[in-house]
Regions:
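Extracytoplasmic cell-surface/polysaccharide-interacting catalytic and binding patches
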Residues: 1-59, 130, 148-155
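Amphipathic alpha-helical interface surfaces
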Residues: 35, 39-42, 75, 91, ...
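Extended, low-complexity, intrinsically disordered C-terminal regulatory tails
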Residues: 44-80
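Short connector loops at helix/strand junctions that flank enzyme active sites
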Residues: 59-61, 88-92
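A broad, low-specificity signal marking well-ordered, structured residues that form hydrophobic/aromatic
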Residues: 64, 93, 135
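Catalytic cores and adjacent binding grooves of peptidoglycan-active enzymes
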Residues: 84, 89, 97-155
């Protein structure tokens, strides 16, 4: 049995928006549940690396907050998400560091991912200093080449 150190299944599937709108956001397909577990394991590795970075640079708390993980089709439609969103597959999360070092986290994550397979790393809605509002991390896409290794910025 695989042990997950930092992230829970509930954390990757909960949604305040779904609760408020009374939308069922529980994944039904086993493949989606497996994807979420794979994402949890990947995020555990990210957290381990970020913990070391925070210790070395004196950044403080290395916790990573999941703002959005898996989204059911109904939830994705309600928030006007992309029809091809990796959140629908359970292979993406919008995350940010609890310590507020969003820019440093994004830059560190880009370097951390440089020798790994992933789909997308997106700096979402950065401020004038380049600090993302959050970071989107997709580990596996739905395309012929699921590991696109794209690093993008959405303004």
């Amino acid at each position: 049995m695989i042990s997950y150190k930092y992230f829970t299944f509930n954390e990757l599937t909960r949604s305040d928006t779904a609760n408020r709108l009374k939308i069922d956001n529980e994944p039904k397909e086993e493949a989606t549940k497996d994807n979420i577990k794979e994402l949890m394991l990947f995020l555990d590795g990210v957290r381990e690396g970020w913990t070391e970075e925070c210790k070395g640079k004196g950044y403080g708390d290395a916790a990573i907050v999941v703002n959005s993980g898996y989204r059911s089709e109904a939830l994705n439609k309600a928030i006007k998400g992309s029809k091809t969103s990796e959140h629908l597959l359970g292979t993406a999360a919008d995350i940010e560091p609890k310590n507020g070092r969003n820019k440093e986290f994004f830059e560190w994550l880009r370097e951390y991912l440089s020798d790994k397979q992933f789909s997308q790393l997106i700096n979402e809605y950065p401020d004038k200093f380049g600090r993302p509002s959050w970071v989107h991390l997709g580990i596996k896409g739905r395309y012929e080449h699921p590991y696109r290794c794209q690093v993008l910025t959405i303004k």
